[in-house]
């Protein structure tokens, strides 16, 4: 026996058979051990051959295991020594002769199996005969498997049934009803059929953006081939999808990948046009299997493609086609491009209507038609970085999954009731141990309350179970209906018209009627929602994008109508600005905003400290309940010409290309937010050129060529231009003249095309002395919040309020000096008192003003007088 004459798999099986004999304690290495490992093989080559030869591989395996169990076992010193049985030596000899006779260079698995069946004296041969296997039938099965090929390499078995291993039969999947229906796309399917019908270079490649339905077109072609809805040249063809991952996986040695691919191509060529090969992600062919000196997959395909022996359909994206396929001109010319564009909104609605039944059956919930329309329109508007119909299908799928999860979960009403029952039962057990009259009286009341709750809970549980069962019944009926429709289609193809008639006019209408009855009995007051509606779709969109597109609740409508009042509580004395921002938000939430522009773009002009940035923070807190939920870009960081790249990302070839831009990345991650460009006049003029597209079209292309959507953002720019005019404006003077002076400066600094795109330019007036009291209240509310954890309560009387307002008012600097006054006059003394222990946690501190100083609980603090800075330590430190 020359081991080198055996293929790698046969060597592996012989080694496994020897290990089995040693493990079982058998002294002889018999043909039974070989038969056992051959039948245990996960790929099932030997088992498949036995079944094809008319035998029963499972029965033979069971009989082999029983025979091995009866073999004598050796333990002790003689264990572990295995001798070759004469029958095994005969089997190896017969296998080598059979291989030589067939012209094989190597002994393969099937030759070894044939040798076992030829030896009628061995127990393995007798078991094969009893199992219905004859050498003649087995030889015929081997020849059918080999298709005239000889074993010329140590991995020859990899070439057997290559298409079964490395491809998926789409026509069979269509026959089994595993493919989703394909709606529309008639033009693309017709163009694909036209290219396939050519004499040479009959290989279409479907090129389109990800998610537009390239693979679906091929599945549609498989369904058409199955239904005979194709020209004569394509009738009865098989459409197989090549699995590149399976081809490459496990190919350890050089040449193994090429051998597998060549085996696939040989089978396709041998079919003489009967097989069309579909290669999804076709760009993976270029460079696949490439190693030093080896050919890649695309070079192996080229000759067969050029001769027209290989019918092939490719599919890839525009970017990948340009990057990989177009560079290889010899490969590109062998394929005929078929461009697949994104379907229109109307076409996508039709596609979703065709898929609806499959998704209803899978999730066990009903999907309303309004939900399908909402999925298409909302995904088209708000999910801009993906393509129809993929994003609309994903929306429908997730909304249905979310509803199904709610149906399977206990309703909130029942859940809270059950939790209350558990709480009362714990209390009941505790009261049972008490003997005082009060506890006994409470126990009687509690038991009555508990009995009532348990009765209500039982009724609700029963009602919930009934509703769940109804949905479950509908799902089962829909699954049954789907199976019957597949059976009907197959019966019509086979010409079994009697069975087709029974199904079409009997069982199918009967099931449809039952489903209609269940759905007609929907209860408006049901505990669980039974259908996916447009609002469910809107909720999913809101989760994905952060854009509040779901239906406004009454509370939110009320909140929007009172927006000025809410923002006015934080921003004092700037009603014009607050009103302009509020109307923009209301317009957007009511759906009256131009869908191709940002929600609003404002330029806030005014002196420092009057509330420009504060209004933006208040707006972010109002919209998102978090004042940090905004992109704040300090434009003083963008004073150089090259700093524009930091906003949108560096172009290709520059350092930081992969990192993305400050502005574009923030909006891509969170499309619904406030964007604040602080101190915009300090930026380089070229920065404004970048903003032109954002303000006008609501979009911006970043350094990597991706389009970022700004249509759901609110853009605020702040500037101090012309603030000196506003500061020096006498009280009561007409603001019109001052506005004209300020606008003159703005026009001199910014270009007309930039200013023309801003929705509103709003002037912030300097703060009046009368408004300082309200600002004191706002600042004090923040200080009180800081002391909440210590339970220290501050009580500020009117005198102290007026004192702080007087000291903190400065027309040139707005409200910021007030913050410093509160810090020095209130926070600093208070901090000392807390550290000294004169103010403890939970204390009440009354703050007043007497004799021109603030008092704390009637006493002036050490630091009541604010000393001017002289460069020397304060007097109190010298005392």
UniProtKB/Swiss-Prot annotation:
Signal peptide position in this chain? none
Region of interest (NBD1), residue spans: 161-342
Q: Where is this region: Disordered?
A: 858-879
Instruction: List, alphabetically, the Gene3D superfamilies matched.
Output: 1.10.8.60, Clp, N-terminal domain, P-loop containing nucleotide triphosphate hydrolases
Q: Which InterPro entries does the UniProt entry name for this protein? A: AAA+_ATPase, ATPase_AAA_core, Chaperonin_ClpB, Clp_ATPase_C, Clp_N_dom_sf, Clp_R_dom, ClpA/B, ClpA/B_CS1
- Indicate the family of this protein: Belongs to the ClpA/ClpB family.
The UniProt subunit note reads as follows: Homohexamer. The oligomerization is ATP-dependent.
Entries under NCBIfam families matching the protein: chaperone_ClpB (TIGR03346)
Name the chain's protein. Chaperone protein ClpB
Name the source organism: Rhodopseudomonas palustris (strain ATCC BAA-98 / CGA009)
């Amino acid at each position: 026996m020359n081991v080198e004459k055996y293929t790698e798999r046969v060597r592996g099986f012989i080694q496994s058979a020897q290990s089995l004999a040693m493990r079982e304690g058998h002294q002889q290495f018999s043909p039974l051990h070989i038969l056992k490992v051959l039948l245990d093989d996960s790929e099932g080559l030997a088992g498949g051959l036995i079944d094809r030869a008319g035998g029963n591989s499972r029965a033979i395996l069971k009989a082999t295991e029983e025979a091995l169990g009866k073999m004598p076992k050796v333990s002790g010193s003689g264990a572990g020594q295995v001798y070759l049985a004469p029958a095994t030596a005969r089997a190896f000899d017969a296998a080598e002769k059979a291989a030589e006779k067939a012209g094989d260079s190597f002994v393969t698995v099937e030759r070894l199996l044939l040798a076992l069946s030829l030896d009628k004296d061995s127990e393995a041969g007798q078991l094969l005969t009893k199992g219905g296997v004859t050498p003649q039938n087995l030889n015929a099965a081997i020849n059918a498997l080999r298709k005239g090929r000889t074993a010329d390499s140590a991995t020859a078995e990899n070439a057997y049934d290559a298409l079964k291993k490395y491809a998926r039969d789409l026509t069979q999947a269509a026959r089994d009803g595993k493919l989703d229906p394909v709606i529309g796309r008639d033009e693309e399917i017709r163009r694909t059929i036209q290219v396939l019908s050519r004499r040479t270079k009959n290989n279409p490649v479907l090129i389109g953006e990800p998610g537009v339905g390239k693979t679906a077109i091929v599945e549609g072609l498989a369904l058409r081939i199955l239904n005979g809805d194709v020209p004569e040249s394509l009738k009865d063809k098989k459409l197989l999808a090549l699995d590149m991952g399976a081809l490459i996986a496990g190919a350890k040695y050089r040449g193994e990948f090429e051998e597998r691919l060549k085996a696939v191509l040989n089978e396709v060529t041998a079919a003489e046009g009967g097989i069309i090969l579909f290669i999804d992600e076709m760009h993976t062919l270029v460079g696949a299997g490439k190693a030093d000196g080896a050919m890649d997959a695309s070079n192996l395909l080229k000759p067969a493609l050029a001769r027209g022996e290989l019918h092939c359909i490719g599919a890839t994206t525009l970017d990948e086609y340009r990057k990989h396929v177009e560079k290889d001109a010899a490969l590109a010319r062998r394929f005929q491009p078929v461009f697949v564009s994104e379907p229109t909104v109307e076409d996508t609605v039709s596609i979703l209507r065709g898929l609806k039944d499959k998704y209803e059956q899978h999730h066990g919930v009903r999907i309303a038609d309004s939900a399908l329309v909402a999925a298409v329109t909302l995904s088209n508007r708000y999910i801009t970085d993906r393509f129809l119909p993929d994003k609309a299908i994903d929306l429908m799928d997730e909304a249905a999954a979310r509803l199904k999860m709610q149906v399977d979960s206990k309703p909130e009403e029942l859940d809270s009731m059950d939790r209350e029952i558990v709480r009362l039962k714990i209390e009941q057990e505790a009261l049972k141990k008490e003997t005082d009259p009060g506890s006994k009286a409470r126990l009687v009341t509690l038991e009555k309350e508990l009995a009532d709750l348990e009765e209500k809970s039982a009724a609700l549980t029963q009602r919930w179970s009934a509703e769940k069962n109804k949905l479950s019944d509908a799902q089962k009926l829909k699954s049954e209906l789907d199976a019957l429709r597949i059976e009907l289609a197959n019966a019509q193809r086979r010409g079994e018209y009697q069975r087709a008639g029974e199904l079409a006019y009997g069982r199918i209408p009967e099931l449809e009627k039952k489903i209609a009855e269940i759905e007609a009995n929907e209860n408006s007051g049901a505990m669980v929602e039974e259908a996916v509606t447009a609002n469910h779709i809107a909720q999913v969109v809101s989760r994905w994008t952060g854009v509040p597109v779901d239906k406004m609740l009454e509370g939110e409508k009320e909140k929007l109508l009172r927006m000025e009042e809410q923002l006015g509580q934080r921003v004092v004395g700037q009603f014009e600005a607050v009103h302009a921002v509020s109307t923009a938000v209301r317009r957007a939430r009511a759906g009256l905003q131009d869908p191709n522009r940002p929600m609003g773009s404002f330029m806030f002009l005014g002196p420092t400290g009057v509330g420009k940035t504060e209004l933006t923070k208040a707006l972010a807190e109002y919209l998102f309940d978090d004042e940090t939920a905004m992109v704040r870009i300090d434009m003083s960081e963008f004073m150089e010409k090259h700093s524009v790249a930091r906003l949108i990302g560096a172009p290709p070839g520059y350092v930081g290309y992969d990192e993305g831009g400050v502005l574009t990345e923030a909006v891509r991650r969170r499309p619904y937010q406030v964007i604040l460009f602080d101190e915009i006049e300090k930026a380089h003029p070229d920065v404004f050129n970048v903003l032109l597209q954002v303000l006008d079209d609501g979009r911006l292309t970043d350094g990597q060529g991706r389009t970022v959507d700004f249509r759901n953002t609110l853009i605020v720019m702040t500037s101090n231009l012309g603030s000196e005019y506003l500061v020096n404006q006498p009280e009561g003077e007409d603001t019109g003249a001052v506005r004209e002076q300020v606008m003159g400066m703005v026009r001199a600094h910014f270009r007309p095309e930039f200013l023309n795109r801003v929705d509103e330019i709003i002037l912030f007036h300097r703060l009046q002395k009368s408004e300082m009291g309200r600002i004191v209240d706002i600042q004090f509310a923040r200080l009180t919040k800081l002391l909440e954890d210590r339970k220290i309560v501050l009580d500020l009387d009117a005198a102290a309020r007026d004192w702080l307002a007087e000291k903190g008012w400065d027309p040139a600097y707005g409200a910021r000096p007030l913050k410093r006054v509160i810090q020095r006059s209130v926070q600093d003394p208070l901090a000392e008192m807390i550290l000294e222990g004169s103010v403890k946690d939970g204390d009440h501190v009354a703050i007043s003003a007497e004799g021109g100083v603030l008092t704390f609980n009637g006493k002036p603090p050490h630091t009541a007088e604010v000393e001017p800075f002289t460069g020397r330590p304060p007097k109190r430190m010298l005392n």
